[in-house]
């Protein structure tokens, strides 16, 4: 699937379309805090399966109960429509 670099207009509306995500340096970033490591790892597992199905993979880190995800598309050197779709799908996985 070919990625399309987002326009300046599309970038300006990212915050309202993606609650919880921040935009900086051509990356979308979001952090989650869970009650414990098992919950954090369970969330990461669900995201991993989703990312694999979408063939678009996040940059992420996990420290105990905190998961941080950053999205960017290296092929276009910035944010693409694929990043938006993955962020929207990840938001649907949120607990609670």
UniProtKB/Swiss-Prot annotation:
<dbReference type="Pfam" id="PF01329">
    <property type="entry name" value="Pterin_4a"/>
</dbReference>
<protein>
    <recommendedName>
        <fullName>Putative pterin-4-alpha-carbinolamine dehydratase</fullName>
        <ecNumber>4.2.1.96</ecNumber>
    </recommendedName>
</protein>
<dbReference type="InterPro" id="IPR036428">
    <property type="entry name" value="PCD_sf"/>
</dbReference>
<dbReference type="InterPro" id="IPR001533">
    <property type="entry name" value="Pterin_deHydtase"/>
</dbReference>
<keyword id="KW-0456">Lyase</keyword>
<dbReference type="GO" id="GO:0008124">
    <property type="term" value="F:4-alpha-hydroxytetrahydrobiopterin dehydratase activity"/>
</dbReference>
<dbReference type="GO" id="GO:0006729">
    <property type="term" value="P:tetrahydrobiopterin biosynthetic process"/>
</dbReference>
<comment type="similarity">
    <text>Belongs to the pterin-4-alpha-carbinolamine dehydratase family.</text>
</comment>
């Amino acid at each position: 699937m070919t990625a399309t670099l987002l326009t300046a207009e599309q970038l300006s509306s990212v915050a309202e379309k993606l609650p919880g995500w921040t935009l900086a340096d051509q990356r979308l970033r979001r952090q989650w805090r869970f009650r414990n490591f098992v919950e954090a790892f369970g969330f990461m597992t669900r995201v991993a399966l989703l990312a694999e199905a979408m063939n678009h993979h996040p940059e992420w880190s996990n420290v105990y109960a905190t998961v941080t995800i950053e999205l960017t598309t290296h092929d276009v050197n910035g944010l693409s429509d694929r990043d938006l779709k993955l962020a929207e799908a990840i938001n649907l996985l949120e607990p609670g």
